[in-house]
Amino acid sequence: MFRIVKWLIALPVGIFIFFNAYVYGNIITYRAVAPHRTAFMSMRMKQFEQEGRDVALDYRWVPYNRISVNLKKALIASEDAHFAGHGGFDWGGIQNAIRRNRNSGKVKAGGSTISQQLAKNLFLNESRSYIRKGEEAAITAMMEAVTDKDRIFELYLNSIEWHYGVFGAEAASRYFYQIPAAKLTKQQAAKLTARVPAPLYYADHPKSKRLRNKTNIVLRRMGSAELPESDTD
């Protein structure tokens, strides 16, 4: 009996250690190499296949300096205003999310920063649980410890979902506006950013009033967005 208990404890601990060693190795690799495909992309494409949707993956990596500053400002203004200064976690946002989750009785709000969203996109899935949030936090801490902010943001910009099968700034710019990501205007960047929290909903409801309202909010906030240092030199 004691041996069984030991195995029941050791097995999940071993899996946790192995997974995080795998993740850490990939984080080191991604400091210099673009991901071939993220875990979230694979999960989403499998979901489309199971639903019988004929969706092709459109994922085009471009370097940081070939993405419009307008899009960078729009995303920071909307998703993580303190990105340039925090260590991966917005503690005020996390406390607010915990309160909302406690009131609802479910894990709905996440208080996720750009770094946390990237951790999910690279290595995790769409599930919502405190265990998954804990794993997301561990990955975020590892990534922030060994990766500079520009690279974290570059990885994020290239992995965001924007439509059915459309991932990354370049693919989204080409899909919606037939231009490279480097040429996005403020209005275009704000409208793309407004889609980020619910890209598939807005893919099905492109004339949503909520999308228009969110676009206007992003436009108003863009002027105060603080970018990582290399964009302010």
UniProtKB/Swiss-Prot annotation:
The keyword Signal does not apply. Its EC number is 2.4.99.28. Pfam families: Transgly. One of its GO terms (cellular component) is peptidoglycan-based cell wall. It is found in: Cell inner membrane. It is a single-pass membrane protein. Disulfide bonds: none annotated. It catalyses: [GlcNAc-(1->4)-Mur2Ac(oyl-L-Ala-gamma-D-Glu-L-Lys-D-Ala-D-Ala)](n)-di-trans,octa-cis-undecaprenyl diphosphate + beta-D-GlcNAc-(1->4)-Mur2Ac(oyl-L-Ala-gamma-D-Glu-L-Lys-D-Ala-D-Ala)-di-trans,octa-cis-undecaprenyl diphosphate = [GlcNAc-(1->4)-Mur2Ac(oyl-L-Ala-gamma-D-Glu-L-Lys-D-Ala-D-Ala)](n+1)-di-trans,octa-cis-undecaprenyl diphosphate + di-trans,octa-cis-undecaprenyl diphosphate + H(+). It comes from the Bacteria. Pathway: Cell wall biogenesis; peptidoglycan biosynthesis. GO terms for molecular function: pentosyltransferase activity; peptidoglycan glycosyltransferase activity. InterPro entries: Glyco_trans_51, Lysozyme-like_dom_sf, PBP_transglycosylase, Pep_trsgly. The keyword Cell membrane applies. Keywords: Cell inner membrane, Cell membrane, Cell shape, Cell wall biogenesis/degradation, Glycosyltransferase, Membrane, Peptidoglycan synthesis, Transferase, Transmembrane, Transmembrane helix. GO terms for biological process: cell wall organization; peptidoglycan biosynthetic process; regulation of cell shape. The chain crosses the membrane at residues 8-28. Peptidoglycan polymerase that catalyzes glycan chain elongation from lipid-linked precursors. Belongs to the glycosyltransferase 51 family. This is Biosynthetic peptidoglycan transglycosylase. It comes from Neisseria meningitidis serogroup C / serotype 2a (strain ATCC 700532 / DSM 15464 / FAM18).
